[in-house]
Amino acid sequence: MDDKSRGTTNAKHLATDTDHPPDDGSAGLPEPGSVKSKTGLFTARSTQKALDGERDEFATFRTRPPQQAAIAMQKPPVPVNKPVTLGRPNSTPELRQTESQGSDDRAEPGYPMSKPVRNMTAGADTVENLLQDNRELPVRNPPIPHRNPAMHPDTSPRPPDIASVSGTKPRPTPPPPRKGGAKPVPKSPSRNEPKIHGEKQSYIPLSNSDVDLTGADEARPTLPPRPDPSRVTHIPPSDHRILLEAHEHSKRHLTPSSPLLDRSLQNNGSSPDLIDYSPGLDEEAMSDAIVASSLASRKAFSAKKVPPPPPPQRQLRTHPLLRPNTPSSDSPRSSSPAPSLRHTLRPATKVGEEELDHHKHRKHIIRRHPHKHHEGDRKRWQSEVTEKERKRYEGVWAANKGLLIPISNSKERSSLEEVSCEGYPPSASEMVLNIAVREIWARSRLPSSILEKIWNLVDRQKIGLLTREEFVVGMWLIDQQLKGHKLPVEVPGSVWDSVRGVPGIRIPKVPSR
């Protein structure tokens, strides 16, 4: 009742001030009172206005019951656009003290104060009209800022009331305004904040359907029933270990590819018998199950790995210094023989005995440079035909002797008549005709002038036929010309002597003194 009487007194006082504005004469005169008291009154009213504005801002978004609306009607609303006056000419210290006590009572009400939808004056409307207007006008629902109850406690230290101090003390010192000194208005318990009843706390989530937009008389929608936590099956850690051990024992008898499948099933969460992902499972059992599954997967994959065989040791190959190309006897031979090229030419002929004897004194252990000029090593003009060359030339002679030579069958004619009539000797069958010689020698591709010179050097009979010795010497001169040697002015006698020997018989040479 004391609160109601105080609210009525304040409402009447404000109504009197509003209905009877000050006269023009009183507006020009200075108001009574000291400067410090006016400053304290201004600071107290501004602080009270800020508190009322914050209270109205938070109370706008809440629905109020009829009892709160009736109490709010008894308290005068705070004018928004009305300028604040420092003092009134008829104000007394008792009235100021009453106003300060009324502000203290309004700052700490038993019920939160809500801001009306439209401006109303005290005594203008009744409680029934206010409730009817609240049903007709929709209340806007702006986004409510989320606040953590732990970070913003409801109880905070309140600074001392400056207006009451200024009324009792003659000259108080106004303290500086504090930023965080305003006491937050106690809020009505909302659905997203914990409701404290003794020591029990329950958290109810806020949804759009739970906000009452029509009014306080309509019944609020009922929330869906929450699942009973007793129905959730809690599997103790021991049961998980038993299941994992049984599963690990069964995995040992499977194929090696089965651990991969089991691990993939565990990763995908498709094995409800091992790990229960229900929300009622406590953290200790979940952690034990995860650790046990990881250990089981490690044991499944930790198979004994056979170390790879060591690489074969490389054997050192030793080669002699003097003959690096010859293979050593210590090195192991490969099983497969080295591939050899096919021989498309004639096989290499063996070196003759005479050539070995001829180059016997020229053998050296260290081979010299091939392009260096040495007078003793250069090839000089050969003064004889070798046995090998002579055999080769005689083979050509034997294949072409007696060709295109007419031979008479009459034995009565004497040899002189044959020479005189035909011009061929009696042994013409062992000779080669000039026409056949020209065809054979032309295959050397030497110019005809060179071939003519060779013919003149070997044709000693001048009858158009060449004997065996003449034909062999002519073939030898052609080979010397092809090798780069010049033709001699006259064939030396040593060359004729080398071709006169009997074929197949070798005459040893007598060393000259």
UniProtKB/Swiss-Prot annotation:
GO terms for biological process: lipid metabolic process. This is Increased rDNA silencing protein 4. SUPFAM superfamilies: EF-hand (SSF47473). Positive regulator of phosphatidylinositol 4,5-bisphosphate turnover and negatively regulates signaling through the cell integrity pathway. Involved in rDNA silencing. It comes from Aspergillus fumigatus (strain ATCC MYA-4609 / CBS 101355 / FGSC A1100 / Af293) (Neosartorya fumigata). Keywords: Lipid metabolism. Belongs to the IRS4 family. Transmembrane segments: none annotated. It comes from the Eukaryota. Residues 314-340 have a biased composition (Low complexity). Residues 14-23, 190-200, 237-248 have a biased composition (Basic and acidic residues). Residues 88-101 have a biased composition (Polar residues). InterPro entries: EF-hand-dom_pair, EH_dom. Gene3D superfamilies: EF-hand. Residues 1-280, 301-360 are annotated as: Disordered. Residues 412-502 form the EH domain. The keyword Lipid metabolism applies.
